């Protein structure tokens, strides 16, 4: 493992990198007094303490010399020094890292997980070493299937595991990969037999190789190892991602550490399996089990930086229109600033979600109606106490009322002429008499009465005009196209100006 100045916090090499990990399931070979038996941190007077529960602390430190130093830390009350742990000893923990570069993991070199898996299954590395020695003497041409038979024994189990992950393959076998230097362990590699052909597994596609690599790591983890998987979703279809996470959850041995930017992983995992790491933070935030509903309905929330929690589909659509308007004016959008819309689907979940997400380290605000404020007053107060900005309609108003009573008369006429294109249902019906009344309206009082009449029709239960995302987008476009005509002191206009600024976009 190599380091550079870029690995240090703010590239300050005067502050060393220090990482400590507490490990259990310690390989038996490391528990002798000659090794690290005296460094176990458990209470050794406890007769009930089993070997699998014994724990040690391994510390990695890197100073300005950029040389990594690995030690096992001494017990706090002991008089012994920290002890260096070698790469060979660390390898016994079977920690492996899965990335996009997996080709070398299908060869039997000593640093590959396939080598570790075979050695673990056979209980000995001699069969592999024996083949290497023979190859050095006679080269690859002298090796036939009989020579590889013993290495093929563990591959039946590996085939079962990889098929559980959703990969359909032929028979697996160990063969000579003629690409590699025949004098190295890389020339003995995993192959697949199909249609009378035998091809090195490294020639498979990215997704297939990744699944095979994960299957090998899973088998190793079953012996108490640790697997690190970066961006698990890379090269995999959504159904396979879900299958992988489900199988990981069933594992009762070993450990799997996964990083992801996939909503499919968030959906399939359980809340207590999820930890959030925010940029600039030095600790992880564990997702609360109470967040299950939010996790299932808004998995995208966990990948944002700034979250707008809104009440329902109308608000979501309205914010989408705001995002499109921002893109036209600033050549940037919500994604540029890491802004994500979260639909709480009404009730006090708006404020519950907002507070929980705030506690996970996200920057959060609320954009919602204010027509049932008495019922939600305690939740609102809790959100304010958590320093969450609330961009709410005037007291007693839903978003539709706030808009209909705020826009200019010309914009109002455009609103009632909505053609409902793309709407999931079409509920806008105006009688000829009402259309004439609207056309003939002159006084402010007449126009106000008409606005209130249209509002009641627009929010009528089970016949709502805009209670869906396309409806919200339409309302958003009406408001934003009429923005300059709305008075500066209007609550809707004030909220939109503040919300844009909160998102990171200046005032027009």
What are the functions of these language-model segments?
Residues 119-211, 216-226:
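Extended helical coiled-coil dimerization/tether regions that scaffold
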Residues 83-156, 403-410, 417-419:
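Coupling/switch segment of ABC-type P-loop NTPase heads
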Residues 96, 227-229, 308:
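Hydrophobic positions in the central parallel beta-sheet of the AAA+
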Residues 10-15, 48-51, 62-64, 88-91, ...:
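Conserved catalytic network of the ASCE P-loop NTPase/AAA+ motor domain
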Residues 36-124:
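A sensor for short, sequence-defined functional sites
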Residues 1-50:
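Conserved P-loop NTP-binding catalytic core
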Residues 1, 183-301, 491-495, 501-508:
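Switch/communication elements of ASCE P-loop NTPase nucleotide-binding domains
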């Amino acid at each position: 493992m190599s380091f550079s100045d870029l690995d240090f916090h703010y590239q300050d090499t005067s502050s060393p990198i220090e990482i400590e990990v507490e490990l259990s399931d310690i390989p038996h070979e490391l528990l002798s007094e000659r090794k690290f038996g005296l460094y176990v941190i458990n209470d050794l007077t406890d007769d009930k303490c089993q070997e699998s529960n014994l724990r040690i602390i391994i510390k990695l430190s890197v100073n300005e010399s950029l040389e990594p130093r690995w030690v096992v830390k001494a017990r706090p009350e002991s008089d012994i020094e920290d002890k260096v742990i070698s790469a060979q000893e660390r390898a016994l923990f079977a920690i492996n890292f899965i990335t996009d570069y997996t080709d070398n993991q299908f060869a039997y070199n000593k640093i590959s997980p396939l080598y570790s898996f075979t050695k673990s299954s056979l209980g000995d590395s001699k069969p592999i070493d024996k083949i290497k020695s023979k190859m050095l003497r006679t080269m690859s041409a002298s090796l036939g299937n009989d020579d590889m038979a013993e290495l093929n024994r563990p591959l039946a189990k590996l085939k079962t595991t990889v098929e559980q992950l959703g990969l359909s393959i032929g028979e697996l076998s160990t063969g000579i990969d003629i690409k590699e230097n025949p004098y190295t362990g890389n020339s003995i590699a995993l192959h697949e037999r199909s249609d009378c052909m035998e091809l090195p597994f490294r020639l498979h596609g990215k997704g297939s190789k990744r699944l095979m690599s994960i299957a090998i790591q899973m088998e190793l983890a079953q012996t108490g190892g640790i697997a690190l998987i970066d961006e698990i979703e890379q090269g995999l279809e959504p159904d396979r991602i879900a299958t992988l996470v489900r199988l990981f959850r069933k594992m009762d041995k070993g450990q799997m550490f996964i990083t992801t930017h996939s909503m499919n992983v968030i959906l399939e995992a359980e809340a207590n399996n999820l930890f959030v790491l925010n940029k600039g933070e030095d600790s992880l935030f564990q997702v609360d089990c109470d967040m299950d509903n939010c996790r299932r309905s808004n998995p995208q929330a966990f990948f944002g930086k700034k979250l707008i929690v809104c009440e329902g589909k109308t608000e979501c659509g309205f914010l989408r229109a705001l995002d499109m308007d921002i893109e036209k004016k600033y050549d940037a959008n919500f994604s540029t600033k890491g802004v994500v819309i979260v639909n709480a689907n009404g009730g006090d979940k708006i404020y519950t979600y907002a507070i929980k997400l705030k506690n996970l380290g996200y920057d959060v605000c609320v954009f919602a109606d204010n027509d049932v404020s008495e019922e939600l007053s305690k939740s609102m107060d809790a959100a304010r106490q958590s320093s969450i900005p609330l961009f709410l309609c005037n007291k007693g108003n839903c978003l539709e009322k706030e808009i209909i009573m705020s826009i200019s008369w010309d914009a109002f006429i455009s609103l009632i002429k909505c053609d409902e294109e793309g709407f999931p249902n079409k509920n806008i019906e105006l009688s000829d008499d009402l259309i004439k009344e609207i056309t003939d309206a002159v006084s402010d009082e007449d126009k106000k009465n008409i606005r209130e009449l249209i509002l009641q029709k627009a929010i009528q239960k089970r016949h709502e005009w805009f209670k869906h995302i396309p409806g919200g987008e339409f309302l958003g476009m009406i408001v934003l196209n009429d923005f300059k005509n709305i008075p500066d002191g209007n609550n809707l206009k004030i909220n939109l100006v503040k919300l844009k600024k909160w998102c990171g976009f200046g005032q027009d």
